[in-house]
Amino acid sequence: MTSMSSLFSFTSPAVKRLLGWKQGDEEEKWAEKAVDALVKKLKKKKGAMEDLEKALSSPGQPSKCVTIPRSLDGRLQVSHRKGLPHVIYCRVWRWPDLQSHHELKPLEVCEYPFGSKQKEVCINPYHYKRVESPVLPPVLVPRHSEFNPQHSLLVQFRNLSHNEPHMPLNATFPESFQQHSGGSSFPISPNSPYPPSPASSGTYPNSPASSGPSSPFQLPADTPPPAYMPPDEQMGQDGSQSMETGSSLAPQNMPRGDVQPVEYQEPSHWCSIVYYELNNRVGEAYHASSTSVLVDGFTDPSNNKNRFCLGLLSNVNRNSTIENTRRHIGKGVHLYYVGGEVYAECLSDTSIFVQSRNCNYHHGFHPTTVCKIPSGCSLKIFNNQEFAQLLAQSVNHGFEAVYELTKMCTIRMSFVKGWGAEYHRQDVTSTPCWIEVHLHGPLQWLDKVLTQMGSPLNPISSVS
């Protein structure tokens, strides 16, 4: 009791009152400092304290915006930790497990939401709602499979390898993304495996039949396979079919009784991450159970399950370039899985470079484009809903069109050093330090759909 009384001995009555609505029992001292800093700001505004207390005491009732001045970088420092103000106070008074601003959306009644970039920002926790994962509609697969459903079709193609003939183009966030918001500057290909993207105004940039650079190593059993590449002549016939963006989830002219719905299921581990140095895999795969994962260059003696610490991994083939690059990874990248979307936030002092076909599709980029994310920036790199739409449409175009989507479920990311047309490194396997993120939910969904569809028209064989 003595320690508790000393904790609040110098706490103002206003702070004590506000702490009465605090959620969770962790980080008492941090919460007290956060509330104390807020009270000092609100006392300068007439009625602000009363408005906040009313909002906290009557959660279901309408309440006013409670604002504080926006700082230069938008963040607020509380006890040596910087964070976004609306996230800090939503964590204190509503959701102690809140990880990121990506998990919050403002209500329509809020006049000063954080995202509006006004001089004032609302920190009323009841002016924000938490993003919920959307329910993905089942994919309807025609009932004409002759394949034994006890076997996974993805396993059959695990040892396939292929080369990407096109050197990846490069883009920088946010500059390149603003340029492409209205459409694509890349030439259109009749062989595009996907329908027009939301950002490309009815056109999709040039998309070769082959995938991004594949890693020149044998993939172990727990790693998703490289994508299957159909024969060139078949892509010339079947791959050139265009897809309508508004097509039904069910195959056209297909009676409902002749389709098998395949539901999306959230896996226990939403992704796995594998680390590479040049073309060598280093260490074991990291399986992410938390929706917030840090991949950094440090060592972690506490063995935190939410961190993948690359500093712990050893490699006898490591050269001086790799050693130097590893020293600059620093805080690395923060991966969030929120509301069916994956975000990558660069915490490192140097940029990270991301190759995500789903992200490229959304922005109207070439599928293999490598996007540079500068320090302090975050980018959405995968959207489950867009993937679900593509999968539902691809089912109507055969096995190969669906299998093409496996390339979308693997995201490559390099630290410090980039690759592509604007860099002297043309392939990700030429970068000193990089990771491969495999999205388990979409991959498992694809596996189930492919199993229902049966074998491809041209059976795949290792014999040429």
Swiss-Prot record:
The keyword Thylakoid does not apply. PANTHER family: MOTHERS AGAINST DECAPENTAPLEGIC HOMOLOG 5, SMAD. It is found in: Cytoplasm; Nucleus. Residues 199-216 have a biased composition (Low complexity). Keywords: Cytoplasm, Developmental protein, DNA-binding, Metal-binding, Nucleus, Transcription, Transcription regulation, Zinc. Residues 13-137 form the MH1 domain. Residues 173-183, 237-251 have a biased composition (Polar residues). InterPro entries: Dwarfin (IPR013790), MAD_homology1_Dwarfin-type (IPR003619), MAD_homology_MH1 (IPR013019), SMAD-like_dom_sf (IPR017855), SMAD_dom_Dwarfin-type (IPR001132), SMAD_FHA_dom_sf (IPR008984), SMAD_MH1_sf (IPR036578). This is Mothers against decapentaplegic homolog 5. GO terms for biological process: anatomical structure morphogenesis; blood vessel morphogenesis; BMP signaling pathway; cell differentiation; determination of left/right symmetry; determination of ventral identity; dorsal convergence; dorsal/ventral pattern formation. Involved in ventralization. May mediate Bmp2b signaling during early phases of embryonic dorsal-ventral pattern formation. Required for initiation of Smad1 expression during gastrulation. GO terms for molecular function: DNA-binding transcription factor activity; DNA-binding transcription factor activity, RNA polymerase II-specific; I-SMAD binding; metal ion binding; RNA polymerase II cis-regulatory region sequence-specific DNA binding; transcription cis-regulatory region binding. Residues 270-464 form the MH2 domain. Zn(2+) binds at C65, C110, C122, H127. Belongs to the dwarfin/SMAD family. It comes from Danio rerio (Zebrafish). Its main location: cytoplasm. It comes from the Eukaryota. GO terms for cellular component: cytoplasm; heteromeric SMAD protein complex.
